[in-house]
Curated annotation (Swiss-Prot):
Alphabetical keyword list: DNA-binding, Repressor, Transcription, Transcription regulation
Stated name of the protein: HTH-type transcriptional repressor AllR
Record-listed glyoxylate binding positions: S154, G155, A156, D207, C217, S234, I235, S236
Listed transmembrane segments: none
HTH iclR-type domain boundaries: 21-83
Entry keyword annotation includes Ribonucleoprotein: no
Function: Negative regulator of allantoin and glyoxylate utilization operons. Binds to the gcl promoter and to the allS-allA intergenic region.
Species of provenance: Salmonella typhimurium (strain LT2 / SGSC1412 / ATCC 700720)
Annotated gene: allR
Gene3D superfamilies on file: 3.30.450.40, Winged helix-like DNA-binding domain superfamily/Winged helix DNA-binding domain
Pfam families, sorted: HTH_IclR, IclR_C
InterPro entries noted in UniProt: GAF-like_dom_sf, HTH_MetabolicPath_Reg, Tscrpt_reg_IclR_C, Tscrpt_reg_IclR_N, WH-like_DNA-bd_sf, WH_DNA-bd_sf
Amino acid sequence: MTEVRRRGRPGQAEPTAQKGAQALERGIAILQYLERSGGSSSVSDISGSLDLPLSTTFRLLKVLQAADFVYQDSQLGWWHIGLGVFNVGSAYIHNRDVLSVAGPFMHRLMLLSGETVNVAIRNGNEAVLIGQKECKSMVRMCAPLGSRLPLHASGAGKALLYPLTEEELVGIVVNTGLRRFTPTTLVDLPILLKNLEQAREQGYTVDQEEHVVGLNCIASAIYDDAGSVVAAISISGPASRLTEDRFISQGELVRDTAKDISTALGLKPPVA
């Protein structure tokens, strides 16, 4: 394959990357200093404490301000930690809360199903694995934490999709397309929508070797106290063991576990 290089002096890209990394390190150092200082400080104190030129410190603060990580007090001119930092921290705490609540239910589901249990969240147009409880079987299906899964072709991904409206689903498909991973991947939009409609009705979705040949998954959505989908829980196992004749019984088990976790997160059951 032909490699295309940008014009420029030899060795130019590496120093540029190093400068970018240095700027990032300094920006993080500023945020850490503000945290140690109770959330606010003057630009001169930040500059002196971190041994940075005043002009560099101010330039970095303006970059952080553009990202809403800091803001400047109009009266005193001091710099304060901004809402962006709170949002990042809240996302981390929220995910940790889901896992801490889900932990005992994941263990129970692993024992009852005999399969590996996973928890995933949506990150843009992908599902990301954030928790896992491995089964005790000699043959088991496991993926590293942080693994990214296609929304349309994985159990957890489809569980994160099926509560969405058709308009939202179409928007995602337009952005990502429907890539084929295996012969059974759902790459036709009407068929995918019908599959998700069925999943919505039964409360769980099935990935029948749609992402990886030989791997079956069953998943269900987890809701928070506001009724928003925050994660998906799934079981995954070899297709030779997690067979089609077990989909209903295992699916109901996964669905009921997702309901229990949602209730523990504060979701109120619908009024009869």
